[in-house]
Amino acid sequence: MRERGSNGLSRRHALEMLGFAGGAALVGRLPHSPRDPVVGPTRVSTTAGPKTFGPTKQIDAGRLNVGYVEAGPADGRAVVLLHGWPYDIFSYIDVAPLLGSKGYRVVVPYLRGYGTTRFLSAATPRNGQQSAVAEDLIAFMDALRIENAILGGFDWGARTAGIVAALWPGRCKALVSVSGYLIGNQEAGRVPLPPQAEFQWWYQYYFATDRGRDGYDKYRREFAKLIWQLASPKWSFDDATFERTAASFGNPDHVEIVIHNYRWRLGLAKGEPRYDELEGRLAKAPAITVPTITLEGDANGAPHLDPGSYANKFSGRYQHRTVKGGVGHNLPQEAPTEFAQAIMDVDSY
């Protein structure tokens, strides 16, 4: 019999869910099944090239003034794509035009603490907890009068999309999530992992210290580039590609949001009381009922779960795909064709 906690999760699954995906290094991959196809190979090199987005737009949404870009027709089916850390909207520089050319209205916002997104009030706490970022997405969709959308994301973005799919399924027509089910909670974040798994979270523990906070502030670009290299060890990106994104880390709230996010996961920083009810619901690891495709790169160097460990968290139509060819953590930018295809396929579910 498997040991279960108060929220109904097995102890093994609770261990795996540290923060957003801790402990995955210790979980062996399951054999591929018809629900777990291998796709690819794909390219693993990226140059910035001449491609760019249209002008960055700004809109007041909830507690933020959000910077975002769009592609495709204004009357197309809405697709909202969400980046992670330490990345930005340019993770979708190839995905957005691919989907736009197929008639989708693609919207890519900067998350709080990135790019041109700003807080409307200096008094608002610079809070990086998961439910705050999810509430940002709901407010952003409200501001753009998007009733529901296909949501896609990786890293922080996948977690945010998954939370909206779980708590507000009427706002999410379908979901594409890199690395699967990433909803976490502070209780899971307090559970110690075996040393090999803890080692993969070195930066989380570094951020728990004043030295880590100051070090990240001083060496934002160097830190981000190291994470890119570790998380995507086979991705060959040029300096222009990195610098294009690194400009987003100059946001005046970036460091506070990032540090609070990781400290909150470990229970070392408090959240805001306004999010307590949402966090209570998320702590129960709610199932995601909307149609979903999860993706994983075959060379993801960041902590991530084995697909077999989270398949039962998706109770609607579901498929997992492993993308071959040396694809790492930043899957939309490393494998844009496969990511865009997943969006189009899940739309038909």
PLM feature spans:
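Conserved acidic functional residues
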Residues: 84, 155, 333-334
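C-terminal alpha-helix
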Residues: 342-349
